UniProtKB/Swiss-Prot annotation:
InterPro entries: Alcohol_O-acetyltransferase (IPR052058), Atf2/Sli1-like (IPR010828). The gene is PBI1. Phosphatidic acid-binding protein involved in interorganelle phosphatidylserine (PtdSer) transport. Linkks a PtdSer donor membrane (via binding of SCS2 and phosphatidic acid present in the donor membrane) with an acceptor membrane (via its interaction with PDR17), forming a zone of apposition that facilitates PtdSer transfer. The lineage of its organism: Eukaryota, Fungi, Dikarya, Ascomycota, Saccharomycotina. It comes from Saccharomyces cerevisiae (strain ATCC 204508 / S288c). Pfam families: AATase. GO terms for molecular function: N-acetyltransferase activity. This is PSTB2-interacting protein 1.
């Protein structure tokens, strides 16, 4: 059988982690519709909706034949979508793909059921838990590295394996699917159960995604530093009164529910399906509507704020009331999309660099910060509330400057050293379990930003459009939480806070929400 190529060292590391129940991909959902007008959120719990049944126009729904026709066109042009991993740990093409190999259909009897389970176009929690905790890929199984859930003929949920689909690939899948969906004829929908047959294509004419982690150095253009400057006092006044003055509980000392598994020895394949692990914790999705998001973007643009640094700053400030000991460290793991730098556009595959930004909790320690703040500002404010507001602003400024400066230093190092820099070596060779053991006082927070990937397409009223999106990745120790966000023109910014069930972070979620609002 013809193979594409062996797995690279980094891809082998990822597959090993997957087999050891340490990760299980990314789930990215999008709602497709031909109408941009959405029902008022207040209508979804009405009696009429409760009693109503699903009754949209046939041509505006993603029927199974329509999905099959779109997938047939898409799969044959994207080798990543008909690839698997054999027992020799090589990527190879599948001989055939059936609809049942990929597509899982979920239907609800009423619109009420649909809205309760899939409000704002995000996947229901039970689906996330099933996909992350119950589905596993085994090399040599002749199974694809992705699957698709179709909910109520409107919501498509893509689940891609980490070995071939990074978070940006998950977003790009929907971009590619939408393009093919709007190019097919409305009268040629396929009832064929066969989506792909290797005999119908010429493999030599297709390019399978290469591994960039074992390649030569990559030189990137220099970037302008994005440093956070002083923010308006009224902005922080609202944050202070609505969040930090409220009483909070404390972070529990429990560890994740994920079982402790040695990464030095692979499990037997027949044990994998019976493993009791939790790669899906508590997920909270929220929407920043366009009006609010545009306001926040205006602040970002005016003050030269890096959005990732801004989110890191929010996370640190919202964690402050939960921290007992400020001698520890928060490490933000931030994947950076390399496709534009490599001229790969909206391609599938693994084309990212992960940065790890260490933020000492001392940056948000009031005792240390107050002395620095008074020394630097000569502020002798008598009003405690106003002083605390300005102190929080000072801490937020420090965190954002620290994160931005670190990111810029790492990108400059990468521009100079290419794939021989420390971050790439860490991605390829470091053992994450060793990191957890050696840094027991350190917690990881994933910042997953795909907001720069546009999922909109210019089209007429007869074209399908993506009207809402949401995503998250699997989570395990030593990750405290992940913050994943994506942007859709119709809905706005969708943010998912994902944390292990053993952590009590409801107060953090409330604080984060108030901060954004």
């Amino acid at each position: 059988m013809t193979t594409f190529r062996p797995l690279s060292s980094f891809e082998k590391k990822i597959l090993t982690q997957s087999l050891n129940d340490q990760r299980n991909g990314t789930i990215f959902s999008s709602t497709y519709s031909k109408s941009l007008s959405r029902e008022n959120d207040a209508d979804w719990h009405s009696d009429e909706v409760t009693l109503g049944t699903n009754s949209s126009k046939d041509d505006s729904r993603l029927t199974l034949p329509l999905i099959a026709t779109t997938l047939k066109r898409l799969i044959k042009s994207q080798p990543a979508l008909f690839a698997t991993v054999n027992e020799e740990w090589e990527f190879e093409p599948l001989k055939q793909l059936k609809t049942s190999d990929i597509v899982n259909v979920i239907e609800f009897e009423t619109i009420k059921d649909k809205e309760v389970n899939c409000h704002w176009g995000v996947p229901p929690p039970y689906l996330l838990r099933h996909a992350f905790n119950k589905t596993r890929f085994v090399p040599g199984s002749n199974k694809p590295l992705w699957t698709l859930y179709v909910i109520d003929e409107a919501l498509l949920v893509f689940h891609g394996h980490d070995v071939l689909f990074d978070i940006f690939s998950a977003a790009n899948f929907h971009k590619l699917f939408l393009k093919e969906l709007n190019e097919i004829s409305t009268v040629t929908h396929s009832e064929d159960r066969i989506l792909f047959d290797v005999n119908d294509i010429n493999l030599s004419e297709l390019k399978f995604p290469k591994s960039i982690y074992d390649s030569a150095k990559l030189h990137l253009p220099a970037m302008t530093p994005q440093i956070f400057h002083k923010q308006t006092q009224s902005f922080f006044k609202s944050i202070y009164y609505n969040t930090l003055k409220r009483p909070f509980g404390y972070l529990t000392n429990q560890t994740s529910l994920s079982s402790s598994v040695s990464a030095t020895q692979l499990k037997k394949y027949n044990d994998i399906l019976n493993a009791h692990t939790s790669l899906c914790g508590t997920t909270v999705f929220g929407i920043v509507n366009n009006q609010r998001f545009n306001y926040l973007k205006s602040i970002v643009n005016q003050e030269h704020i890096c959005l990732r640094s801004f989110i890191c700053g929010i996370a640190m400030i919202c964690l402050k009331p939960l921290v007992k000991d400020f001698s520890g460290t928060i490490v933000f793991t931030i994947p950076i999309n390399l496709r534009n730098h490599l001229g790969l556009g909206g391609s599938l595959g693994l084309f990212f660099k992960e940065l790890r930004v260490e933020c000492p909790l001392s940056l948000i320690d009031d005792e240390l910060s107050a002395n620095e703040f008074l020394t630097n500002s000569n502020d002798n404010e008598d009003n405690d509330d106003e002083f605390n507001e300005r102190l929080m602003e000072y801490q937020f400024n420090k965190v954002t400057k620290h994160v931005s400066g670190f990111i810029m230093a790492k990108l400059r190092s990468w521009e100079k050293n290419g794939f021989n820099d420390d971050d790439i070596r860490r991605m390829k060779y470091d053992n994450d379990d060793d990191f957890h053991i050696q840094n027991s006082r350190t917690k990881l927070i994933q910042i997953n930003d795909v907001s720069d990937i546009s999922l909109s397409m210019n089209g007429d009223d007869k074209s399908f459009k993506i009207v809402s999106t949401g995503f998250t990745s699997s989570i395990n120790r030593p990750t405290l939480m992940s913050l994943s966000y994506t942007y859709c023109e119709e809905m706005g910014l969708n943010i998912c806070i994902h944390y292990p069930d053993s952590y009590n972070l409801e107060s953090f979620v409330e604080c984060f929400e108030s901060f954004i609002e």
